[in-house]
Structure formats: structure tokens, C-alpha cells
Amino acid sequence: MRKFIPVFLLSVFVLGACSSWNKTATGTAAGAGAGAALGAVIGGLIGHDGKSAAIGAAIGTAVGGGAGALIGRKMDKKAEELAALNAKVETVTDANGLEAIKVTFDNGILFATNKATLSAQSQKELKEFAAKMADMPDTDVTVYGHTDNTGSAEVNEKLSTQRANAVAGYLQSCGIASSRIKAEGKSYTMPVADNATKEGRAQNRRVEVYVSANEKMIQAAENGTLK
């Protein structure tokens, strides 16, 4: 039986072997949080240095606890399915205070050093991810590319953007609509570990894929029709 580890991030870190997914918040609590802060950016991606970026689009209206619970259960179920990937899957909180999913891919698996061309293995992993997302068209997918702090900010900004775009483009080719996908390079501005060590730099070289409820899913949850 998998144990849930509290986190406040929304990513999946691909390791050498299949990893478990980690639950961070229940749908009820997340929905209640959104209701308490109208349209506030509550959730996000929080780096080692404390910087953060919101995940998903804030809809500007309160989301009730009941709707949050429905979305939470749907995200839990999908996270369990995604756990079959060669990845670590976590549930986190998005910009509306709702449960979302984070998938983080190690750049060492996705790309060759200083390259932005997807490897055959990474294409296989991303194709499997896209296939498992086919039954959730009412979600948004956000892709962030990250690097360590080796090299100039300009070089790392370009590389992280190219890698994020490569992942987003491949997911589109696998059937995820371009209207659902956002890609952005973060360079080394949001580390999750200490760049002073080799191990820390390895953790910081990653691509994160975030899955969050879009307005259509939220509306269905509010109406009680979300399945």
C-alpha cells in the first residue's frame, strides 16, 4: 500500500524505476480553500529558493467544497493510473485551490546533455502519459523546463524553453490539443535542491508536467455532473 507524503508541488520526478504517487490535499479541503479566497492564486510550483508560479488558470469565482471533492476524487484516480509510468506522481494544489497532478521528468532520461531532442525512451514515456490523459479532455497541461545553474542565464533560459517546447510539442503530436498546453522555460530560477552539490544539480535538471482542472471540469463539478 502506498504512503502519502505531504508536498506543496505539482510534479512528477522520473527515477530509474517505477515510483509511487504522493497525495498532498483532499478535494474537500482544496475546494474549501478556493471558496475562502475568491480567485486567489493559492497553489503553485514552489522552488528551493521560495519562488513560485501558479499552476492552472484562476477562474475568478469561488469553487465550493463539494465541487472540490469531486475534482479531488477524479484527480486521485488519474494519479493512480499515471503511477504505472516510470515516474513519481504527486497530487498538489492549483491556482483555484483544487487538487491537481504533477509529473516531473528527469532531463537525464528525456534529453542528452545540453540537447533538447527527445530520446526514444522519453518519447515512449510521454506517449504513455498522453494515452492515459485521453479520457480527461477537460484539463489543462502546463509544461515547465528547468536547469541547474551551470552556465549563463541566457543559455539556460534558451535550453529550458527548448526542452519544455519539445515535451509540449510531442504531447500535442500524441493527441493532446494545443489549446490545452502551455510550455515555459524557467532556467535555473526555481531549484528544488542545492545547486552547490552534484546531486542537487541533477535534481534541478528536470521537466515538470502539470495537470489541472479547466473551467469545463470545474463547471461540471459545480453542477454535480462530473464523473
Tell me the role of every PLM-derived stretch:
Residues 19-81:
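Short, low-complexity, glycine-enriched hydrophobic/amphipathic alpha-helices that associate
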Residues 37-38, 74, 78, 122-125, ...:
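Stable alpha-helical elements in mature extracytoplasmic
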Residues 74-102, 222:
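Amphipathic, membrane-active segments
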Residues 110-144, 172, 209, 216-227:
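Periplasmic peptidoglycan-binding/anchoring modules of Gram-negative envelope and division proteins
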Residues 97-101, 105-107, 114, 137-139, ...:
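Envelope-exposed proteins and targeting segments
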Residues 14-17:
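C-terminal motif of bacterial Sec signal peptides marking the signal peptidase cleavage site
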Residues 146-220:
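Periplasmic OmpA-like peptidoglycan-binding domain that tethers envelope proteins to the cell wall
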Residues 2-10, 38:
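Sec-dependent signal peptide recognition
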